[in-house]
């Protein structure tokens, strides 16, 4: 079964990122995740911030892609540099925890604060947890 139109002369990275995300979360057969990851990787290599955040997250946690925190942090940093809320949060967390990069909690928290300001739910939750009194 084909999910996409015939090969485009110059694929649109945002289309590839969106299609990859949809296919990755709707797994009807064994070939779908491979196609999704192909689309996401291609879009990430073409500077799509959404794709970079998804590929980075997948590498960071070893979900759908090999566990590789350094590669994960790399893609998340690229996404964060473009201001993508998920990239900001996950790269900030990498910095706070030293996952795939040298620890820098102060800078990491700045990224997470920016992610929360952009509406990232996980960032808001993380900040709330950091402000909660220790039990």
Regions found by a protein language model. Give the residues of each.
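Terminal, low-structured helical/coil segments at or just beyond the last alpha-helical repeat
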Residues: 3, 116-135
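Structural signature of tandem alpha-helical TPR/SEL1-like repeats
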Residues: 29-39, 66-75, 102-111
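Short helix-capping/linker turns of helical repeat alpha-solenoids
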Residues: 11-16, 25-27, 45-48, 61-63, ...
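Tandem repeat protein-protein interaction scaffolds
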Residues: 49-50, 61-66, 70-73, 77-78, ...
